[in-house]
A protein has these predicted regions:
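Basic- and hydrophobic-enriched, low-structure N-terminal and domain-boundary segments
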Residues: 1-110, 114-122, 127, 165
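P-loop NTPase motor domains
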Residues: 74, 78-89, 93-340
Length: 340
């Protein structure tokens, strides 16, 4: 053998010896890296949290879904499950009870749903939290909807936009109708009327300002007036079109709002007005809030009034769909107040 080959063999044996010594001595193991601050931060200050810090930051709660589903040892602390400690059958969940946001990012198949979302849904049910789940594939409704309803007594509502005919109802006017019904039964109940007006204003603003933008420049008047006019129409519909013996079904929904605005665009032959909205408002008492909300549109010119009503119709066009109406025209299984 030449001297070069012998030298290379010796170098290789030396490297193997160093690697073996490092491996068996444990010097290169991550387990031997201590959470010890080095220097004055010139090499960085990040480090792993100690067990004491973890216990101080998070609540360690035994994760026992088998017992929870029997109604036993239900957790009292509400929060997000961010991790776990322990071994099989003795797992303690790390629960953050602060008012925080959590973003889970991972590649396909890493367990975002099975190992993160499902444990959080189980814990939310056990601790009594209301939650909204965006379920584009339908897995959550199939896998955990029945669990939440059967074992924890939850009221589950599924809004299925893929198959609206099998979806639960979601009437946008549910709360407005409810509080307006209370007002009719108790005319002096100002709190109920105030809530009906509040929810009508919220709904109108959401429909008119769909992108959440409130600055329309020179057209700002038309959008503000459209918002007030839509609020007025919603309140009128909720107050004067309740179910009766002739029409026992609920007719107060967003499609009826569109139809009423469309009908009010027609000229009033009796009052000889270019639209029927002004004569309708004249029949209301001067102190009626619907008349106040529509004040900006009522005091404008006929051309501006037509533009305002056209703006309302254009915003309501998004709700005109035969399938979508199967969801929007039926009372909600739950409302925002029940959810909260």
């Amino acid at each position: 053998m030449s001297s070069e080959i012998i030298f290379l063999v010796l170098c290789g044996l030396a490297l193997l010896g160093v690697a073996a010594a490092t491996h068996f001595s444990g010097q290169g193991s991550l387990d031997n890296i201590k959470s010890k601050t080095v220097g004055d931060g010139q090499h960085g200050t990040a480090r792993w949290a100690t067990k004491e810090e973890i216990k101080k930051t998070y609540h360690l709660i035994p994760f026992q879904p088998e017992q929870w589903r029997k109604g036993e040892h239900l957790p009292q602390a509400q929060g997000l499950v961010l991790g776990c400690m322990g071994k099989k059958n003795k797992i303690a969940a790390l629960v953050d009870t602060d008012d925080i946001h959590c973003l889970m990012i991972g590649a396909s198949g890493v367990g975002k749903t099975a190992f993160f979302l499902y444990p959080n849904l189980e814990y939310a049910c056990a601790s009594g939290m209301s939650f909204l789940a965006l379920d584009t594939k339908g897995d959550l409704a199939r896998n955990y909807g029945a669990v939440a309803s059967k074992y924890y007594g939850y009221q589950v509502a599924v809004i299925d936009l893929r198959n609206p005919t099998r979806s639960d109802g979601y009437n946008l006017l549910t709360l407005i109708n409810h509080y307006m019904d209370v007002c009719r039964a108790e005319p002096k109940n100002l709190a109920a009327r105030a809530k009906a007006e509040k929810y009508a204003k919220i709904l109108a603003k959401t429909i008119v300002n769909q992108n959440g933008e409130g600055n329309y420049g020179q057209n700002q008047f038309f959008y503000d007036a459209a918002e007030g006019l839509l609020t007025a129409v919603i309140l009128l519909l909720a107050e004067y079109l309740p179910p009766d013996q002739e029409h026992p079904e609920e007719r107060r929904h967003i499609v009826s709002v569109f139809k009423l605005v469309q009908d009010l665009l027609a000229p009033d032959k009796i009052a000889k007005a270019k639209n029927s909205f002004q004569p309708l408002m004249d029949k209301l008492p001067d102190t009626h809030k619907a008349r106040w909300f529509a004040g900006a549109a009522l005091t404008s010119s006929d051309q501006a009034m037509a533009s305002v009503m056209s703006t309302v119709l254009s915003r309501l066009n998004a709700f005109l769909d035969s399938e979508l109406e199967q969801v929007l025209c039926f009372d909600s299984a739950m409302d925002a107040e029940t959810f909260a």
